[in-house]
Amino acid sequence: MKQFVTLFFVVPLTFVCVTNAQAHTRLAPADENFGRFGMSPLEITNRIHDAQVRGASYRGLMGMQGAIEDWAAKYPLDPWIAPREYLMSRLFAGLRSHDGNAEAAHCRAFLRTHYPRTRYK
């Protein structure tokens, strides 16, 4: 009887708990830091906005790109990543330089590879 209870009640309950835990880790916590410069998702968003308003530098964008790629590696299902990566590709292209164009192409390839179903292309 004890084996019956374990097999039919405890094992499915364990599966439900693990599934729920995975569902909660879909989004990155706002206070978790990514990349070499330790940027949170909110800081990345704010820096992208600042770069759109004030202008971007290649070095600053590369720091944000590294943080986004680190974020995507840890939370690949986070829906905040694809729109930010798209904006990064636009910012890199806006630099109008060989390095900027190459990095913009890298961002677009990253989107196609990691988020093929996104509307951000």
Map each language-model feature to its residues:
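Bacterial N-terminal signal peptides
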Residues: 7-16
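Positively charged n-region of N-terminal signal peptides that target proteins for export
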Residues: 1-4
